[in-house]
Amino acid sequence: SQSAWMASIEIYIDVAMAAQSEFIVFSPGRWGQQFFHKEKGVPLNRICMVSNFMGFALDHLKQKTSLEKNKVLILAGHPAKLAKVIDGHWNTHSSKSPSALPTILKAVENIFPEITQMELQASKTVEHLIQTSEKNHTSKVLFAAVAEKISQAVSKYLENRMPVEVLLADFKGNLIGRAITHD
């Protein structure tokens, strides 16, 4: 049930906050969890699976009086899920929030020349956008900008109480974007 899942998210977060670690990791799902485990070598049980409930998980995290500047919140996953928070969609389930594609395209609309922008706008899905941006060599800049917008949105949601790092990956498990906010 949803309430049981949300209770498990609270437990994941409580355990992660109690751990003697410089970071806490949120991932929307198993895919992001596996990616982060591979990227950083962090044990799978140390990665908080927050599913579609990013806002709920962040609210639980905010309740912790021990939010410290020396602990970093890391979000790891696919931009199709994580970029939804840029526009304030904190429940990222497809029935509760729109596709992240328009949000991503809007976030980078002034970065590239018009011809490149038109190529990117032709994408049908976020994964298609990733492939298109890799072909025209704009992927690094595009997804660094998206990761930056995500980290800023989450940092603002947390009232700048802790640094936020974002690691974005494609479905092949390749790191495609990274950003960190410091406050």
Model-based region annotation:
Residues 1-71, 81-82, 86-183:
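N-terminal loops that bind phosphate or other acidic moieties
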